[in-house]
Amino acid sequence: MKRLLLALSCLIACAPATLLAWSNHSLGTWLALADLEELRQAEPVQVESLEAFLAAEGVALEQLLDEQEAFARENFPDYPARPDDLSWLPGSTGDRRRAFLMALRVNPEIRLASFVQALPGLQLPDHRFLPAEQVLVFRKLNLWNEWRFIALSPGERIGPLAVLASAADEPDYGHDINLFSDNPGEVGARYGFGTQPFGDARFEYSSQAPFHIGYYHESALIYRAAPFLARTYPEMRVQQYLGLARFAFESGHDYWGYRFLGWALHYVQDLTQPYHSKALPGETTATLMWTAIKAALGDTADKEAAIERVATRHTEVEKYQADWLRRLLREGSNDSPLLAAYRDRSVEGDYPPFDLGYLRNVVSLEAYEAADGFDERIGAWLAKGQPGADFSQGNQLKPPASDPELDAVLVQLIRHFSGHSRNLVRTTLRNP
């Protein structure tokens, strides 16, 4: 049995932990929240640097962060306590911004530029664009070739939806990379998260996966074989950033209220993606056990095929959905079911008010239950010969042919994405 559990553990440990869920969170957030009354009625907010926020509220932030840490230790299973030497001390000298980020246990090298994304209909004609390297910390920036970042200046006023939507993409800009003890850099050895639980620690993108994935609903046998699956931390991030958002609103720093709220929203949206809520969609405990038995006996073909299948399907469906959305926005196709899904409120009556158990018990569970059907539908689409590899006129790759059944599944998942986004934002703004 021990050998079998080891083989099963190795299979799950090798499962691909991908970088992004739903591609550009800002675009989806902009569409999902465009008609939210609480945002439509809100006044423009004044841009403020993090340094100014810390200078004004440093003493009160010490109490907030200590209370958050105590809550996490008491309420989050398998929570790795923050080392005491990382506590936020408002009177300390030195780099206050770095000290604050380390108290949150995020990557202290993140840029935190003052910016908004160039979103559909957002008019800021006299502003310059920022190069991607001033916004993201990654060495390879090709994934963000189509993103455009508009520079803002402290003191200017900007609509809160633009701030919130732009911030919803930020945690993918390096907030959670290199935080484990076996990652490059110095902070992983100090943060207390231990070694990276899954993913390939050699790649900078991979190291953020345990913060953007929530495997909360696997079977007891899976957890026994792979206890490292419990070491995921999106609940911690949501609790941190929601608390900071409410604090910022209460203390009159509305810009940071919306920005922190966008950061919290990111992790909720991540877990609406089924591949972020189930370790190996398309595999039951029984099929995983059989694959593990064969691997333990030396036949690794099924293991390698399962890993490759999940990686390919996740990657291709993300490209498909992102390309579909961008094409619709370029064409102005407002009657598309995908665009309608971002505005659709039909599922919201099924959701309870947002609380700190919501991410695990509502968002992740819903995505977990959809995972196998989603994976099967992607497989059927790919079996038709997609994605397209033929060239059209102009020597450009043809876009993948649409699949009505896959489209219907994606539309329903986007309803979930949008409904949970509105639920979180509405709850926070009504109860700051």
Regions found by a protein language model. Name each.
Residues 7-16:
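Bacterial N-terminal signal peptides
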Residues 18-247, 277-432:
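N-terminal, motif-rich segments that launch catalysis or mediate targeting to/interaction with membranes
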